[in-house]
Regions:
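Non-catalytic cap/lid and distal C-terminal segments of serine-dependent acyl enzymes
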Residues: 1-112
Length: 112
């Protein structure tokens, strides 16, 4: 997940997201992965508390630089038995991709 990369970025010198920025946005990078900024933590807390968890729609372009971390989160959701729908297609993290998948996601949300 992106949160794992952000936690690492805050620890690296000369990173595109220096530790000061990570601290300003997320708090202590050493505690980030165990914090409520991590969707995995939030999901597990909600599940353990017996809360009704939201259904999740995921769409990602196979050429998107975030494809790998999206696959990681997808596998996490599968392992947790989450109620989610996943699809991918040709595209990157651009409006060309989202113009196709946003309406599909909204339609899925309204039906589910």
């Amino acid at each position: 997940m992106v949160i794992h990369e952000v936690a690492e970025l805050g620890k690296r010198r000369n990173s595109i997201m220096p530790e000061a920025m990570v601290r300003d946005v997320f708090g202590d990078p050493e505690k980030l992965l165990g914090s409520d900024y991590n969707p995995e933590v939030l999901y597990r807390k909600g599940k353990a508390a017996g809360k009704t968890l939201p259904k999740i729609y995921m769409a990602i372009g196979r050429e998107d630089s975030l494809y790998g971390v999206n696959q990681d989160f997808r596998h996490f959701l599968e392992a947790e038995g989450a109620n989610f729908f996943y699809e991918d297609g040709h595209g990157m993290h651009t409006w060309d991709f989202w113009n196709e998948y946003l309406p599909r996601g909204l339609e899925w949300t309204l039906k589910n």
